[in-house]
Each structure stands twice: as structure tokens, then as C-alpha cells.
Amino acid sequence: MSALSTLRHTFVYIMLFVALSWPVQAYALSIGEERLIGQKILYSVRKDLRILDDPDINQYINRLGSQVLQVVGPQYFDYRFFVVQSDQFNAFAAPAGLVFFYSGLIEAMRKEDELVSVLAHEIGHVTSRHLAQRMDKGTKVSAASLLLGLAGLALGVPGLSQGLFTGSLAAGQTINLRYSREDEEQADRLSFGWMQEMQRNPESMQDMLRTMRRITRYRMGNVPQYLLTHPNPEARLDYVESLLELHSQQSSAWTKTDNFDFLRFRYRVLVQTTDLDRLRQYCAITLAQDKDADTQRMARFGLALIDAQNRRFDQALEQLALVQGQYPDRNILRVDQAVILQMAGRFNEAKAILDASVHRDPTDMYGLFKLAQVEAASGNTTRAEVLLQQVARAMPEYPQVFFELGQIEANRGASGKGMFYLGKYYLYQGQEDLAVQNLRRARRDTSVPKHMQEEAEQILAELEHINKET
């Protein structure tokens, strides 16, 4: 064994001993307080950032999170995972199990294990309650101040309220909330162990940290060190490389991940968040030069999405047909085909494909939602409503499903029910004033069913409580 390897092994053993010897932390936040702050932060994020509220993207990232949580074990919080439009290379965990990934980070990834490594790292911060530990036990810090501090960590995100950022500096919370080196090492150590349990390749942690180091070096001149949510990637990289050396004999147990779902998810994100001409150029280069078969094939999928966005539907369908030929058993590609047909106004063809696809996989909320839209556009509003209610039960914070339900009720002349659904749409879009306005009207409308009036009252009370407490 080399002297460097011996030194790294010794370092890891020392750090593990120190970690086990750390005293139990005193938390400034109770579980209930953390949940309340999480609710407020989510409302604020919806207001100031653009969350990709797409059932396809949402379902993938949350399924992946659930896979990690299965090995993590019981938790205090119900975790939720979101993709936010931003070219920043970042992800952050907020209180109460809210985890946000920037589209710029996803763009830099090349395989699913890299996404899992970051996802597990953020879960490590939440399950260790690092934010609660960062609080000063002797000082009463409001949820609003904590919110400002978290907002300050999201430096450089287009659309982030300048008032929030300025306030976070004035409140002095940004420095207090910075993760320590020990926090980062604990999150990396937990992530490493969970990936091993999942038989995922933890070398992906090393790959992501190398990318982070390169990007941090490039951007360091513009971003103060104390504002980085994950400081010092060099030290983290050394620590993870030490763990990899320590467990190198277990590398044969790591399974090769099928990256189809990840690559499809990645292109679905990028086509909504990046310049299409630049993305087309990237896809063309990948198609011509990449040696990995899946990466090369799915670059054509990216080209199909770009053509569809540019309303070149025939070319999009031709590109997608080539991808389907490479993956004949992937039902989700049939849904993608139907969506392009729907965009082209070919509703009968889209409906036939979506009916068959949903029958094969009734858990696919993306397919269900698109089928509901096709049914509504074809005048079959009764079935559309049934399908939309299924989606609403599975994804109760997806704004567009309530917009579609509101449209159906408004077209029927049921204005009260339409206002109720419109209120929920605005609520999950982050437009609180409009949400309150419509929910109050629905609550007072005697034509609105009692259970809807009660739900409107409950939402209004919850909003009042959150605003009062924070």
C-alpha cells in the first residue's frame, strides 16, 4: 500500500472515530417548527423561483428520492423533491425534507448515479438536521429570518427577490446557516453508505465533486466563499476518494445503472430551461461523437423534443420513431409520441396511444394528465374530469391539474367551483393574494359543495397561521 493510501486510510478512520464521538446536538428548532418553516419556504420558493411543475419530471425525481429513503429508514418528515429553473450548479435542502435541484446542476450530470449521489447527500443534511444545528440555541430566530438566510444561499438564481437577498444579509443569517466541513463530511459519509446499500456506484460522488471543483474554480471570483451552499469541494473530494479507497474491494458489488430514464428526464428538463439552439448543437455533437450507446441514442430524443417545441412536428415524430426503434419496450416513449401528436392537434391519434399506454401503466401521471387534456379538447369533459381527479389525488400540489379542472367547471357555468380550483392553482403557483381572493369567494358561494367550502376554509386558515407565525 502506498504512503498516500496509508495516510488516507488513517484520515478516514480518524474522521469516523470523531464522528462517532460527537456530542448529541441541541436543536433550536422542534420538529413542528421545522415543518412550519418548510411550508413557508415552499410558498416563498414557488413565488420567487420557477419550479418545473411537470408530472413527468416530478414523478421521476420523487421516485428516485423514495428509493434512497427506503434504505435511509423512518424519517420525521415527508420528503419532497423539486427541480428549479436556474443555470446555477447547485442543490439545497430546506427544513422539513424539501430538496431543490437547479436545472444547471442536472445539465452537468451524465448518469443517474450522479443524481442519486447528490440527492442522497441532501437527504443526509436533512436527516442529520444540520440546519437546526446551525441555529443559535440562545437566540430566538424567526422563521422569516431563517427563510431569508436560505434565500441568500440561492445566490445568482434569476428571478430571486432582491429584497429577500438583501434582507438575508441584513439579518446576518447567511453565515450562520453555512454548512460546516463536518456537516459536509457527515452528509457525504451517509450518502456513500446509502449508495452502497442500493448497490449504486459511489464513484459517482467523486465524478460530481470533480465537476463541482472545476465549476467552483471558474466562478470563484464572483461568488464569496461564505455564500456557497457546499463550500470547499477540494476537501470533500479528498474525503470521498479516501472512502472509495477504503471500500475498493467492494466495487464488484456495484451494479451498472440503466440510464435511459435519467437521460430522458435530463432532456425533458433541458428543453424547458435552456436555449434550444444551444441544446440542438449539444445533441448533434453528442450524437456524432459520444461513445456510450444510450447517451448517443437519447441525444436523438433531445432533438425530437426540440423539433416539437419549434412546431416541426413531422420531424419530431421521425426522430422519436428512431429512438423507439432502439427501445421498443419503453412505454413512456409512446406517451412522448402522443404528446407530440396532441401538440400537432391530432387528438384522435394521441387519444388511441394514450389509452393504450395508460392501460399498461396506470401509475404514470404524465400519461394520465395528457389523456385528460386530450379528452377535454375533444369535448369529453366527464372523462377528463375523472382523469384529472386521479392526477390531483396522486399529485395534490400540481398547479396545472387545478387549472384544467377550473376550466371545465367554468365552461359548465359552475363559477363557484371554478373559483375554488383556480384558487388552488394560484396557491401552488405561488400567487398567494390571488389564491386567497378566489378561495374566499368559493367559501362564500352557496353553490359550492360543502366539502370544497371546508377545504377552502382549511387552506385559508393554514395560510393565516403560516403568515402569523413567520
List the model feature ranges, each with a label.
Residues 27, 39, 51-53, 59, ...:
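Extracytoplasmic and endomembrane cell-envelope/extracellular-matrix remodeling and assembly machinery
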